[in-house]
Every structure is written in structure tokens, then in C-alpha cells.
A protein has these predicted regions:
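N-terminal Rossmann-like FAD-binding beta1-loop-alpha1 element of flavoenzymes
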Residues: 41-67
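Short hydrophobic core segments
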Residues: 45, 212-224
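Flavin (primarily FAD) binding-site architecture
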Residues: 219-236
Length: 406
């Protein structure tokens, strides 16, 4: 199976650094780790997918785990938008699709007995816009055009991609339910330090500064946010990488309509342009007459949208989609937007650490370990966050074993 250039570079960096596991090892990592020393206290920074899976597996291994999360919810960039929509409709702010070859994502979906459903509809036609032309195509033609445009295998056959019934954030909430009070929400980190005996984190909770100590720390905070934390416990090389890692913009605009007027024209609400924008209809298999069309703008177009005020984003998108689908303006009820550069606890959608820096970026420093989609070959996917979290579980368990022998 073909891989992306980005995945090739990341995999090469992992091999050179000898600081990670290959994908087949990651798939079995949880089954091969055995607690071989007394349980240690592990402090995990961030309750996104990497932090959650690490906390879940370390807890099963018998370690004493605490998670600090700045937000008031789990999931990080896996979040389902339900407000301000009517009739229980929803759409995704972040991760939405599960390619068929993302084995770790499927593993935990199955473990938590979460139902899946197709991401793309098999009926009606999608739209393809290319060099000024407009063409109606069946969904397989739509996904073929998308794959051709990006120039690489997107992860199996897109028409076989799935989504989690009820919303993507059902998965992080399943992790969080099992971790319970181990997660401390509303607790942003302000300082990370360590010495030969322990690691320490200073954080805020209810406006008051507090300190926690641990045998090991797993930091899953995006580098775009971590660069604003006092990193006294890290090397100058690591701090330089954190400071210079680039995060891309992604912007999404959602339009709720009274009726799914596009279906009257034989369209399923999905469209692909030759530029940096996809159009999805996440409500195609949600009940009721109302629907949501959403634009998914990637770097380039996303920065332009982010600079607009929210009402301008909605108005501009309504005009664009109205021209594409027709009849949309009369059916429009309300809109919403999500621009990840503006998100206080993400400051971007996904990261590019860079080939020359990747080995140093993923390497632990003393008692402090690192994980997240930004430190994975599967950048921007739930699969990436999960795989990096499991890598960190392996690292921490090995660290504990070594320490026990000293």
C-alpha cells in the first residue's frame, strides 16, 4: 500500500532515531507490556487521544495515573459540535473519518463496543469542481478525484471509511468514563521541571496555582501551546524544536438548513474542489428534514477564513455554497464556525516537526516523555495520537523497569 511523503519522512526519522516502534509493534504493544517493577506515579499532561490511551493502558498495568487537562472536556481536537444545531443534529470540529487501515483506532472502537457507520453515502451524486468546471459524479468518482488531487493513498478505499455513530467524541468520552476522577479538568500547565528524584508540574486550577510531583511525566500538549509553558526541565534543543514547530490552519464553516434542498437535485451534499476546500454533509444519515452542509478548508484558504469575523465567514460560505447547490439561501437557518488557529488549547490543526528534528522531538528527556499526533507518522489522525500514546506507554514502562534495577 502506498504511503504519503509525510509518513515516509516520519517513518525514516523514527528508524534513524531508534526511539520508537514500527506500526506492527505498536498494534501489539499493549499486549506485550508486562509490569515488571513496583507501580510508579505517572502524571499525564493533556486528555486528548494520546493522553487518554496512555492513561488507560498505564492504569491497566497498575501504575498510579493522574491526567491534567486544560479544557473542561476530554478529546482535544476530537470534538463533536452539537450547539447551535436543531433536532439533535451534529457535525465534527476535528477528527471525523476512520480509514479502514487505521488498526489502532478500530481496536479501541471495538474494545468499547462503539458502532460505526459509513462516512460517505453510497446514493446520489457528489460534485467535483476542477479548473472552473462543475461535474456531478458518483461517490467513488468523488473519492478517486480526491485521492488523485492529493497525490497519495489516503488510507485504504475512502468509500469504505467509517465514522463513529453519535459523533467522534464518543471515543474519547469512552476513555474518560473509564478513567473517572483520574482526570482533572480546567487545569492548564504553567511549568514543567525535574531533578534526579522526581518530576514536577505547576498548574492552575480554579485560578489557584498548584504543584504535583510524579516519577514520570507524559506531555501530550501540542507544541504550539507548550511553547508558552515554562520548560525549565527540558534541554535547549528540545525547547528550540517546540518553539519552531509549525502548525497548520484548518477552518470549518457549518450551515444548518430547514430542508436538504440539494437532495431534490440528486446531490448528496459532498463536493470537492481543486483548491484547498472539501464540502461535507455530515447529516446525510441523521434523522429529520433539516441538514448541515460544512466546508473543510485546509492551509491556504483556512488562514483567509480565520481572519474573517464569524458572521463574515458564514455569509461568505452561504454565498459560495448557494452558488454551488442552488436554493440554499432560502432554506438557511443558522451557522457556526471552527478555526483551529484560534483555539486556545490547540493553536492549530496539525503539526510538521520536520525530518531533521523528529528524532529529537519524540525522544524522552529524563523523566519526561512526549506523545501526540505531532509526534507520530500518522499526523492529523486519531491513529497518530493513539500510536504515539502507546509508544510512550512502552517508554515509561521500560524506564520504570530500569529505575527499579538501579
Amino acid at each position: 500500500m502506498a504511503i504519503t511523503r509525510r509518513q515516509f519522512l516520519r517513518r525514516s526519522a523514527i528508524a534513524v532515531a531508534a526511539a520508537s516502534l514500527n506500526q506492527s509493534q505498536l498494534s501489539g504493544a499493549v499486549r506485550t507490556i508486562v509490569l515488571s517493577s513496583p507501580a510508579r506515579k505517572v502524571l499525564i499532561l493533556g486528555a486528548g487521544m494520546a493522553g487518554l490511551v496512555a492513561a488507560y493502558e498505564l492504569t491497566k498495568l497498575g501504575h498510579d495515573v493522574t491526567v491534567l487537562e486544560a479544557r473542561t472536556r476530554p478529546g482535544g481536537r476530537v470534538h463533536t459540535l452539537r450547539e447551535p444545531f436543531s433536532d439533535g443534529l451534529f457535525a465534527e470540529e476535528g477528527a471525523a473519518r476512520i480509514p479502514e487501515n487505521h488498526d489502532l483506532t478500530h481496536k479501541y472502537v471495538k474494545e468499547f463496543a462503539l458502532p460505526l457507520e459509513p462516512f460517505y453515502p453510497s446514493r446520489l451524486n457528489a460534485l467535483r469542481f476542477d479548473h472552473g468546471g462543475r461535474e456531478e459524479v458518483p461517490i467513488d468518482g468523488f473519492t478517486d478525484a480526491m485521492t488523485q488531487h492529493y497525490g497519495y493513498d489516503l488510507g485504504g478505499t475512502p468509500t469504505r471509511w467509517t465514522k463513529i455513530k453519535g459523533g467522534s467524541d464518543v471515543l474519547p468520552r469512552a476513555f474518560a468514563e473509564r478513567l473517572g476522577t483520574k482526570i482533572h479538568y480546567g487545569s492548564p500547565v504553567v511549568k514543567i521541571e525535574q531533578d534526579q528524584k522526581q518530576a514536577r508540574v505547576v498548574f492552575l486550577n480554579a485560578g489557584k496555582q498548584q504543584t504535583m510531583t510524579a516519577d514520570n511525566i507524559l506531555c501530550t500538549i501540542p507544541f504550539s501551546v507548550l511553547r508558552n509553558v515554562d520548560l525549565a526541565g527540558l534541554s535547549s534543543r528540545k525547547r528550540e524544536i517546540i518553539q519552531n514547530t509549525r502548525y497548520d490552519a484548518v477552518a470549518r464553516v457549518y450551515l444548518q438548513t430547514r430542508n436538504r434542498v440539494w437532495e431534490d437535485k440528486g446531490l448528496n451534499g459532498f463536493a470537492f474542489t481543486a483548491g484547498a476546500v472539501e464540502i461535507w454533509q455530515p447529516t446525510w444519515n441523521q434523522p429529520g428534514p433539516r441538514g448541515i452542509l460544512m466546508t473543510y478548508a485546509r492551509p491556504g484558504e483556512a488562514e483567509r477564513i480565520t481572519k474573517l469575523k464569524e458572521n463574515e465567514r458564514i455569509a461568505t460560505t452561504l454565498k459560495q455554497l448557494g452558488d454551488m447547490f442552488g436554493g440554499l439561501r432560502d432554506s438557511f437557518e443558522r451557522g457556526a464556525t471552527k478555526c483551529w488557529l484560534d483555539d486556545e488549547w490547540s493553536r492549530g490543526a496539525w503539526a510538521f516537526v520536520g525530518f531533521g528534528n523528529f528524532g529529537a522531538a519524540i525522544a524522552p528527556e529524563g523523566r519526561i516523555h512526549f506523545a501526540g499526533e505531532h509526534l507520530s507518522e500518522w499526523s492529523s489522525w486519531m491513529q497518530g495520537a493513539l500510536s504515539s500514546g502507546l509508544r510512550a506507554v512502552k517508554e515509561i514502562d521500560e524506564f520504570v523497569t530500569v529505575q527499579a534495577k538501579v
